[in-house]
């Protein structure tokens, strides 16, 4: 346990670092966005590149793969939509005045965040902006969306305010904001962090947002009332990435650890160590926690025991993103390569320290 393994396949077609990796809803394809200004589509069946998307005038910061289209955003201030069969650019969404950091496609809407201090909403089928969310005092980074159907139980006399759902944004100004998509108005400002908000995760049924910050904390918020519910304090460095799984929050940090917290109490129930640099990416899959780090390694931990099960070595620089499909781990790195790893045989039980039942859904 903990030993290194060789990659099943190394895909090195990009000529610059890979900034993001997105898995299609059916798990059959992967999309990578790169510093070389292109995005590439890959088959998960054989690891072959099946489409190249060219057109951005600067590096690709983020990407999202849907069933019928691929979406990319770039430092060239634009978002683009691509045909996954032909590689043709179907739409260019213009309006941001600086680097576009993130995109999120949901309910036939495209949301984007930018260094220009705004988030924007577009119809997926049109190139015209439908809403601008303005109010942050600095760069806007992470995005999350709560659809109207997720808010149904909370709707009351002001149903029209929530009719388009809620958008949650995090910013380097130290706040997160909750926006009414239908009107573009700020519904709540979530204040409490003393550093930039780098990541967020949304519990839509519970109307709760979890934010991670350079102030080394994770915070839980009621997105309807704006109330700060809990502060998770044990990290010793910036919180870089978050994932919410079965009412447990996993947080990856510059302190070289991942921590597992009970979402409803804020209790830290597990710390995953062994990283030699910051934890830059994480993904939970079938009882295993996969992590990517600035030390150029990916790791697999048993989530019940915290035991390190496997180390995946081969990348030359930081791993920026990871995905898992069936029995294969996909890692994308600033070294420009996408690597595929066999993860069969990881669920051998280690010494068990069960999480209290109240932390499970």
Each model region followed by its residue ranges:
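Terminal intrinsically disordered, low-complexity extensions flanking WD-repeat/beta-propeller proteins
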Residues: 304-361
